[in-house]
């Protein structure tokens, strides 16, 4: 029998009891159990995603969330914890290029400022002022998407200005509404994101305290508020922010000096061989001398000299003789050198005639010594 016929045949006084019986029907019980089962499954999957996040398997975490349909505005509205996990994972993810195209598209839709999904997500996140750290992650993700997705400079500049305006407005709302429950660490982080990530990174400008003071000029209540909030006993949020800017400036200067020093060192090493004697013999003598010095030092420290194929003295003497020969052939055996040598020889012979007598006895002495020299050489050869 149809349900309408049953309702028509029931007496009026029994309608309430019939409705009561209908509520206790197995169909409704099964429906409740089905809903509970779905919720249990969703909780299990969410816990699995959380475990992947804790293990720093961020790519797998995001892929799992996409697979089960968690990256959806309806899901975000009904379960903010899923949204918090998604934003945190996207914030940690180094680059979206490692993700699949479908997942990339879902992420870009959530964090691209003018998309309907981003507008709805922004309403959910920025509406809960108590979650400032999650809000900061959301802004960092928007910055990351601007860098990742926009190659046109003009479009990137427009999106940067739009994000700058959104962040400035939110800072004003936050310090106005959260006077007594301000998250000082989160607020400092938010201001530094605005300065270093938006002003410096996206606008491609050098850090300067003027960036902070320009924001304070736009938001007159900002500086007095930050001066009155302390991170520690003697350091206010404003002091910490200005110190961070100064540290960033000093680091940039140090990097710049390091690069310049590296260039100078490369130039020095490139020209260094030209500063020394270009002759190969000079280099050989220096190498031999260095080898001898190192050998002596090792001999003093260990008491034993390293074994070598050639004697160090022989190498040093041979190298020295090569240099001397090279110098002699370059300096003496030329026209001027020969002329000067000849004149000196004539003067010596003329002044010291006694030398001639010595030269007369040289052949006889040589014939006398020659057999002994030959015998000595044969003896050395036989050893």
UniProtKB/Swiss-Prot annotation:
Subcellular location: Peroxisome membrane; Endoplasmic reticulum membrane
Keywords: Endoplasmic reticulum, Membrane, Peroxisome, Peroxisome biogenesis, Phosphoprotein, Transmembrane, Transmembrane helix
Membrane side Cytoplasmic: residue ranges: 1-331
GO cellular component, one term: ATPase complex
Entry superkingdom: Eukaryota
Keyword Phosphoprotein on entry: yes
GO terms for biological process, alphabetical: protein import into peroxisome matrix, receptor recycling
Main location class: membrane
TM segment ranges: 332-349
Coiled-coil spans in chain: none
Membrane topology term: Single-pass membrane protein
Keyword Cytoplasm: no
PTM summary: Phosphorylated.
Lumenal side, ranges: 350-383
Molecular function terms, GO-annotated: protein-membrane adaptor activity
Subunit note: Interacts with PEX6. Interacts with PEX19; targets PEX15 to the peroxisome.
Function of the protein: Peroxisomal docking factor that anchors PEX1 and PEX6 to peroxisome membranes. PEX26 is therefore required for the formation of the PEX1-PEX6 AAA ATPase complex, a complex that mediates the extraction of the PEX5 receptor from peroxisomal membrane.
Protein name: Peroxisomal membrane protein PEX15
Organism: Saccharomyces cerevisiae (strain ATCC 204508 / S288c) (Baker's yeast)
